[in-house]
Amino acid sequence: MEQYFDAYRIDHVLGFFRIWEVPSQHIYGLLGQFRPALPYTEAEIHDFGFGGDVQALCVPRVTAGTMQKLMADTENAKLAADYFTKDGEWYVLKEAYRSQRAICRLLPEGKTRHTLLQVVCEVLFIRDATHAHLFHPRVGAQRTWLFGALSEADCQAFNHLHDHFFYERNNQFWADEAMKKVPAVTQSADAQHPVLQLYPLNGNGMLPCAEDLGMVPASVKSVLERLEILSLEIQRMPKAYGVRFGNPLDNPYLSVATIATHDMPPLRLWWQQNGEQSQAFWHEALHHNGEAPAEATPEVCEEVVKLHLQSPSMLCLLGWQDWLAISPTLRSKHPETEQINVPANPDQYWQYRMHLTLEELIQATGFNDKVRALIAASGRLDN
């Protein structure tokens, strides 16, 4: 492959650290768990100061108060009698309805089905798929009615054990897992290549670039640096916790800077779809005052392109849609058609095509000269 390519992308590199596994009997990702992982024992959970019944909190249940609210809807009038058993202060979901796929099979589309699908998620812990005596905190369980029924002390304890599990406990374990697998990928392309003049990667002829977006474990950065794999840096998907927009000028050298991936709306479409976000971007990322323009004008798009070109990232790879966006005459009149892939829509296919012909592009000397000038001004053009 190194005869044809100077670089390759490792898609969803986080899967080499761990994957999110959703049981076959369920539909919602909230009921999944990381594999591999280091789940808790009951004793470890109680060591955090959590006093609840861990095994009981693996079974979907709601309080009498929650049940009363659910049954206020006339379509749910028989909810308690038909689908729950009373256990002290709790209404516990009957075993036949603890599978989301079973619910979809047994109940027609409607309010009751929707309610039961939601109630199945009313757990604080999920048993490990392999070792039933071990437990994973349900991700985001703080948004359940069940969490709201805990004492203040148990809420604090659960928050601690939840965050420790997802952000600390597994970090080194996941790093070790990745080191068993990722080197096999990078070393498989081992060959001498002129790209090594720019990128001395222990003889590897192709430059590995990771797609490391999403819920990124803290250990990913150190593993990628150790293996000299470029990270992917996107301004509106910063990796720093609590930061709304990153600053491309802060990107690490071993990275690829881009405005959007093929799974994201290009800048113009994102601006159009996210009025509140684009307003914040106008102030926080571009440092302008006043009201943001209703659409991403050519001037705005050029400003964002320049910012990425000027980043310290080794590579700046921008989508063609974002390049064309800097031209008032060549940009598409229909930005809603420019997103290549919409992951949430299974019926949307990779149908994007450039709206210009190659002949038209060749003749657009003003645009071509401008692109070259922008790249040259950033120091990325080897004259």
Predicted segments, located by residue:
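Catalytic cores of glycan-processing enzymes that make or break glycosidic bonds
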Residues: 1-383
